[in-house]
Amino acid sequence: MQGHRIGYVRVSSFDQNPERQLEQTQVSKVFTDKASGKDTQRPQLEALLSFVREGDTVVVHSMDRLARNLDDLRRLVQKLTQRGVRIEFLKEGLVFTGEDSPMANLMLSVMGAFAEFERALIRERQREGIALAKQRGAYRGRKKALSDEQAATLRQRATAGEPKAQLAREFNISRETLYQYLRTDD
């Protein structure tokens, strides 16, 4: 049964170009998530999983665009292929159908493990770079949401009993950020 070719694209940040991932690839519909790969709650991935039917092919630029770790990758590939949906990874040149040979399953495991390893190396280099920048005094981290004066006012008003949700809205911060300010004294 010949179905539709459906694309899945994931970009980690809003400045990445999602079109680049499936350029020159014919697909009838594309689902695009702007979220981290480690976040398994991706609305467009969930929509794709609900949308695809037996005979369809899901086209993904590379394995690391679908999942950041081997367990999630295997689970998603198995979930799709058990429903009669093919999955095609362009960068790796691999297609999975559910009737895969032991060699294809080995390739899925090896390539998925390499993607996971590569991500771990990137995170390690990022941490090392931040540590070096901190030593040189060049890294200051994220800009604070509130000035010291605003933070002091926030603490006073929260201590006085004003509703925290109202304060968060007024200061234009999330409630989690509000609670972080209330936990710290700086």
From Swiss-Prot:
<dbReference type="GO" id="GO:0003677">
    <property type="term" value="F:DNA binding"/>
</dbReference>
<dbReference type="GO" id="GO:0015074">
    <property type="term" value="P:DNA integration"/>
</dbReference>
<dbReference type="GO" id="GO:0000150">
    <property type="term" value="F:DNA strand exchange activity"/>
</dbReference>
<dbReference type="Pfam" id="PF00239">
    <property type="entry name" value="Resolvase"/>
</dbReference>
<keyword id="KW-0814">Transposable element</keyword>
<keyword id="KW-0233">DNA recombination</keyword>
<feature type="domain" description="Resolvase/invertase-type recombinase catalytic">
    <location>
        <begin position="4"/>
        <end position="137"/>
    </location>
</feature>
<dbReference type="InterPro" id="IPR036162">
    <property type="entry name" value="Resolvase-like_N_sf"/>
</dbReference>
<dbReference type="InterPro" id="IPR050639">
    <property type="entry name" value="SSR_resolvase"/>
</dbReference>
<comment type="function">
    <text>Resolvase catalyzes the resolution (a site-specific recombination) of the cointegrated replicon to yield the final transposition products.</text>
</comment>
<dbReference type="InterPro" id="IPR009057">
    <property type="entry name" value="Homeodomain-like_sf"/>
</dbReference>
<keyword id="KW-0614">Plasmid</keyword>
<keyword id="KW-0229">DNA integration</keyword>
<keyword id="KW-0238">DNA-binding</keyword>
<dbReference type="InterPro" id="IPR006119">
    <property type="entry name" value="Resolv_N"/>
</dbReference>
<protein>
    <recommendedName>
        <fullName>Transposons Tn4653 resolvase</fullName>
    </recommendedName>
</protein>
<dbReference type="InterPro" id="IPR006118">
    <property type="entry name" value="Recombinase_CS"/>
</dbReference>
<comment type="similarity">
    <text>Belongs to the site-specific recombinase resolvase family.</text>
</comment>
<feature type="DNA-binding region" description="H-T-H motif">
    <location>
        <begin position="164"/>
        <end position="183"/>
    </location>
</feature>
<feature type="active site" description="O-(5'-phospho-DNA)-serine intermediate">
    <location>
        <position position="12"/>
    </location>
</feature>
<dbReference type="Pfam" id="PF02796">
    <property type="entry name" value="HTH_7"/>
</dbReference>
<dbReference type="InterPro" id="IPR006120">
    <property type="entry name" value="Resolvase_HTH_dom"/>
</dbReference>
